[in-house]
Design a protein with these regions (language model features):
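N-terminal signal peptide c-region/cleavage motif recognized by signal peptidases
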Residues: 14-17
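Central antiparallel beta-sheet cores of small beta-barrel/beta-sandwich binding domains
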Residues: 23-99
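Acidic, Gly/Ser/Thr-rich repeat motifs that build Ca2+-stabilized beta-propeller blades
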Residues: 86, 107-108
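Short, exposed beta-strand-loop hairpins at the edges of beta-sheets
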Residues: 98-101, 108-119
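Sec-dependent signal peptide recognition
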Residues: 1-7
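Edge beta-strand at a domain terminus
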Residues: 115-129
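Short, linear, compositionally biased motifs with a strong N-terminal bias
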Residues: 10-11
Length: 129
């Protein structure tokens, strides 16, 4: 019985890790308020977090934003079907929202929601690494 429980726990951990692997990497955001960013997604405990590593003007020219190094995808917990729930920070207005995201290969759809998820804005990000 102990072996069965240990095997089930290992399988659960492996499933969570493989779900996180799908989103781990560097992603390019959509242009928001005249700029876009590269965000690196990494495991943070049992969840995934994303931090801005580079910022660019809409024309692609790099610029030094005060948001470089800021975590904007916060504690996104995998649901096991390619979807995640957690929080997202929007640098252009300084607000944190209930977040949802779904990864599909090299595409990621990220949503920030208010009013219990009734009103959401979304972005589609592209994997760059």
């Amino acid at each position: 019985m102990t072996r069965l429980i240990a095997a089930l726990m290992a399988a659960t951990l492996a499933t969570a890790a493989s779900a996180q692997d799908a989103v781990v990497g560097t992603w390019q955001t959509e242009v928001d308020d005249g700029a876009f960013a590269y965000v690196t997604m990494l495991s943070c405990g049992a969840a995934v977090c994303g931090t801005i590593i580079n910022t660019y003007k809409a024309d692609g020219a790099p610029y030094q934003s005060e948001n470089i190094g800021r975590q904007i995808v916060i504690d996104m917990a995998p649901k096991g079907d390619g979807t995640y729930v957690g929080r997202v920070y929007r640098p252009s207005n300084g607000k944190t929202y209930v977040g949802k995201m779904q990864v599909n290969g090299n595409a990621l759809r990220l949503q920030g929601c208010v009013a219990g998820g009734l009103l959401c804005a979304s972005q589609n990000w592209a994997r760059i690494q």
